[in-house]
Amino acid sequence: MAKEKFNRTKPHVNIGTIGHVDHGKTTLSAAISAVLSLKGLAEMKDYDNIDNAPEEKERGITIATSHIEYETENRHYAHVDCPGHADYVKNMITGAAQMDGAILVVSAADGPMPQTREHILLSRQVGVPHIVVFLNKQDMVDDQELLELVEMEVRELLSAYEFPGDDTPIVAGSALRALEEAKAGNVGEWGEKVLKLMAEVDAYIPTPERDTEKTFLMPVEDVFSIAGRGTVVTGRIERGVVKVGDEVEIVGIRPTQKTTVTGVEMFRKELEKGEAGDNVGVLLRGTKKEEVERGMVLCKPGSITPHKKFEGEIYVLSKEEGGRHTPFFTNYRPQFYVRTTDVTGSITLPEGVEMVMPGDNVKITVELISPVALELGTKFAIREGGRTVGAGVVSNIIE
């Protein structure tokens, strides 16, 4: 059989495996790469290679993550797998590996377990938009009714966290059996189940919108006044596109202002437009230098609003990661570093939570002293005197 050509023109999607410890996330990751390698769509990665995940630092937090890549007939995937539960929590909260969708691995022999629930909840909180389920270890379950029962439990659990449980694709199989078959050089009955899973992922997880197609947003890093030309605001465009003549809003810290872009520059050259990822200077009509400061954002009018009060899901750095050595309580007042600036805020812990220890993850309510442009999924760091003590993501906006 002729191998298909590996091409880079397919749409790109980021996914990852989530689920309870020992339910087979890493084995499934290895099985997917092994089965697809037989079709010339991936390089085979063995279990140990994925399991010995290198440690990476993301905003000072140590996270062990394995990245593998593979293709299906329709897409190119970047796939992340984490060895430990704590690594998943950190990964999802910091957005170190942004996921467009996830494969939830549940052992058919055990059914949903505490971390199954926690990963679904985290997916909801941090905005992983779509989940496909793989019921693993099917070879260990003789009773078809038991399999159906586990499937029902998983659907109920997904629905409880506002995922469409009834419509979620669920594929049963055995990652280990598929991996063994693939290592022997063939796609057998178990390998077919892995291919079926990937066909569901292809069909169910939509291709994400490209950053350039989203609404324009640029965090303000610096502001200059250029004689005879006006005020230039510099920063890296987070998403969208900005062109000369566009109306933009300046949001955060002070009342929102509207203005018009009269120039876009990169490396002192005039551009027709700046797009996501570009470091640019944007010239603003009639805006005074003192009206704009670091920590504000330039955006498409009406696309993002300033807020002071929100709920967030946070991970608190352990002492070993350079975090606090002691717990904190309600009314703790650190700085919240959002995009390009620190804003002081006070924390309220959930009812029944007395204190938060270094190394914990928890949901908090925050009230900032000045409003910042926020939306669901905005990432922030929690700092004390310039040192990072936590990381979080906005899960709900209150006011």
Curated annotation (Swiss-Prot):
Cellular compartments per GO CC: cytoplasm
Compartmental location: Cytoplasm
tr-type G domain boundaries: 10-209
Positions annotated to bind Mg(2+): T26
Keywords: Cytoplasm, Elongation factor, GTP-binding, Hydrolase, Magnesium, Metal-binding, Nucleotide-binding, Protein biosynthesis
Pfam families registered for this protein in UniProt: GTP_EFTU, GTP_EFTU_D2, GTP_EFTU_D3
Stretches the record annotates as G4: 136-139
Region (G3): 81-84
Tagged with keyword Lipid metabolism: no
Gene Ontology MF annotations: GTP binding; GTPase activity; translation elongation factor activity
Enzyme class at the top of the EC tree: hydrolase
Designated name of the protein: Elongation factor Tu
Natural source organism: Helicobacter pylori (strain ATCC 700392 / 26695)
